[in-house]
Amino acid sequence: MTNTKYYPDVSANVDFAAIEREILKFWQNNNIFQKSIDHRDGESEFIFYDGPPFANGLPHYGHLLTGFIKDVYARYQTVKGKKVERRFGWDCHGLPAEMQSEKELGISGRLAITNFGIEKFNNHCRASVMQYASEWKQYVTRQARWVAFDNAYKTMDKNFMESVLWAFKELYNKGLLYESMRVMPYSWACETPLSNFETRLDNSYRERTDKAITVSFMLNDITLFNSMISQKLGMTGGDNFKEYRILAWTTTPWTLPANLALAVGSDIDYALVNKNDVCYIIAASSVAKYAKELGLSGKENFEIIKGLKLQGLSYKPLFNYFENHPNSFKIFASNFVVEGEGTGIVHMAPGFGEDDQILCESKGIELVCPVDNSGKFTKEIPDLEGVQVFDANDKIIIKLKEQGNWIKTEQYIHNYPHCWRTDTPLIYKAVPSWYVRVTQFKDRMVELNQQINWIPHNVKDNLFGKWLENARDWSISRNRFWGTPLPVWKSDDPKYPRIDVYGSIEEIEQDFGVKINDLHRPFIDELTRTNPDDPTGKSIMRRIDDVFDCWFESGSMPYGQAHYPFENKKWFVEHFPADFIVEYSSQTRGWFYTLIVLSTALFDRPPFLNCICHGVILDATGQKLSKRLNNYADPLELFDRYGSDALRVTMLSSNVVKGQELLIDKDGKMIFDTLRLFIKPIWNAYHFFTIYANADALKGTLNFTSQNVLDIYILSKLKIAVNKIEESLDNFDTQTAYHAVSEFFEVLNNWYIRRSRARFWKKEKDTDKQNAYNTLYSCLETMTIAMSALVPMISEAIYQGLHNTAITQLNCLLLEGKHVVQNPMSGTQDYNTSVHLCNYPTLSDFEINHELVSTMDNVLDICSNSLFIRSTKNIRVRQPLACITIISKHNNNLKDFEDLIKDEINVKTVIYRDDLENYAHKKLSLNFAILGKRLPHKMKAIIDASKKGEWETSTLGLVICGEILNSNEYKLVLEPHSHIKGTANFENNSSLLILDLELTSELIEEGYARDIIRFIQHARKEADFSITDKILIEIISEFDLSKIIENYGDFIKEQTLGEFAKNFMPDYVSKVALENNLIQLKVKRL
């Protein structure tokens, strides 16, 4: 026996995490990532934008999921021949960095930061934003994601910031920017406004209970209604009401001190309710809710008037804080007032409500906003100065009760927006801000969105499309510190107004005569100059305090990373838009949105052409992953336990890539199952090949010419799988791609290898044996390349092993790190050190034998169904059965594989029939969910008819109760006649098999012989014998086995490479049970 080995010694029980660590070393030592880019120089590019994360926190499972998806398509496009640059990037500015710094410095609020010093604060932010960069690199590298960290862009870099300035000025020059004091979502905890889309990020709405109150406002003019309605209302004590009071309902009592108007619905019916000669005005539909407060019995009749008649009436202010405010304290009609909750009357505080501001401005009422940046009342409300608005509610309610304006207090449960950084409830507050006129070009955004391929596809017109249709102007300025400063300088003297907007560092340097080394505050704030429009020379141009919304910077990533237009103009034109981006679904309100806003406004182009919106990862109970809940494991721990390929497969083969949720358990059972059910079968096929190829001292080659029917079948299945993976990944569908891999290895292991064992085991090294090795080798090498993006490290390990590189020595390759391998795509010699440097296989010289595949798949179906019947009847596979009857219209094809069927399911005879009607009938199975929606009124009759078999098929389809059913509304299921046992359907429910389950004594004896063979093979394995070792066997039994040995002894010896003997010193002894009888088995290696 030769000692020549062409392949590593591969263990069946392998530590995949250890293998991955070796692969990572191999990639690093051989610079494989950079080679994968360099060797595609001159090829067309696949443009990929890497959305920048913040580096002031550790990566979580969501980051890993996004990273896995990015890596799959980058690797895939590389093996498809594209050049794929993968430049990493960091988000550096904004609230995440500032909040972290405030926490670390022990300060809070704008005043505290100013006192601390803006320069020192921003220096701390600059240092803190990158504090986890090394950990990020560790996580990203360990997950086998290839990115260029060394050339990473940062939004805090001067060049990136300058591109942001350019974008701002471009928008300004196009008339797409304006400054305004508008009501916006406002985080009092962060002391900054938020964009409307930021309140939609990460499900920032929380259930909250607030006090909703109803208050009465006294009308000033009480004569309007008296003469008209006093008699109808049955008043007492005279012909006049003493007072008219209009009732308003609000969930924000703290806004009442800033009330300046009331709004009613023009067409809403309002009831005039008499209580003790006071007329209360309330929507007629809401009267019943206030019966107790208004002393009503439910039998009263009310005078009804339309809301339009109330317009223009004035009322007495609840408080005297703004009693002299011009044009205020009147009732106005508006179409945003609706019936339902409350009283049908809305109180207007234009400083705290967007609709309020719009209505009041249209009536000449200037807003008031007596709340400061930290959400506390200012001195304009002296009774509440310094009180946080939510803490003021009870104080306001008490005062209203004392004044006689209070009617009712309720506990109101509603979904309320919270700050996405601090999780504190937002308020709506008027703040000065710069806005992008998104409403001016939103229709164009909707048009450009149609050019984007969204995954899932419904995002285009639903989640994202509807968001674009309702887009609002975007507030892009923030009164914060750590960010790109708005390049706007204003005159400090309103008598000589002037605004200068700068779009480059050069422009700033020219006007201010200084060298700009840092664009951040406070350095940029210190740049001042005399106002050129002031003839007195006294007014000064000063920069406004605001910085950019960090989302503006994220949306500037395509040109910011290139320092466009100051550098790399040609590069940018060639790399815009992106071919592909990916993030989780909430980014339709974040990065995806800001990208398309700026891309449309600046370039009139979509920013990307393909976009995956994946779902979110939750714990096993459906809760968000949280450090506080301790409901997830550190990803690095899972990598060390199961490897990162297993986590990659777990995530990307699930519905999370289609925008749905993925529930993952803390202990990693789901990942272990992936390892066991997906990755281990791949390794098992590789292990089988190496162990037998080494035993035979044979080397496999890429060869697709074998005429063996099993070889042709598995090579056809291989090409089908390779094509399916390619089609799936071309369509950004990893789920289907992983299924194609799993399905192929299921057939390879459990059909091809098992059915070809005799070819691998036989002694002769003939052409048939070599063809078997070549075929299995071709399957393994081709699939490692095809699936290299899906399981990059296991693919690399197998690929290297197939090229005679020991797994533990991957970082010690010879020939200057290169191996000569055959490329299955071209048939030429390529110098590839890695599977990731190969070209995607096409198998262009091999034609799929579709007829063989169809027939063999039916054979496989017959065998698997037969084995299932055995399992359900508790008949072991080693027990022979008399026959199987196959009832099909395609028996002629099946007859060619009769011996295979007999051997696989262990039967003596195969009987073929085509008279299906004598064995089974068609049963109608209805799809109630679909059919019930179309024909709800006929469902009972259709169900009854289906049970009675009162239906028929025609050229038009299936007809029942006079209705023609659609193909997705029913199935015709083959159902055996009740007296027939041991049956199963196959060939898409059009054929039937019947397994004869009766056991004769001869069949039972042969079954025992096969059991003995299994016991001996198990003993060989436990004794650690080689598969080629010949052995001695002795069997000592409690019952007589002589007849079995006499009839099947030669068969037993052939299958086990053994000879029967007695009185020898065994290497291994075992005791086993055969049909409840004890057998002692002794074996010895010869």
Swiss-Prot record:
SUPFAM superfamilies: Anticodon-binding domain of a subclass of class I aminoacyl-tRNA synthetases, Nucleotidylyl transferase, ValRS/IleRS/LeuRS editing domain
EC number(s) reported in the record: 6.1.1.5
Cofactor(s) needed by this chain: Zn(2+)
Motif ('HIGH' region): 53-63
PROSITE patterns: AA_TRNA_LIGASE_I (PS00178)
One GO CC term, this protein: cytoplasm
Record's protein name: Isoleucine--tRNA ligase
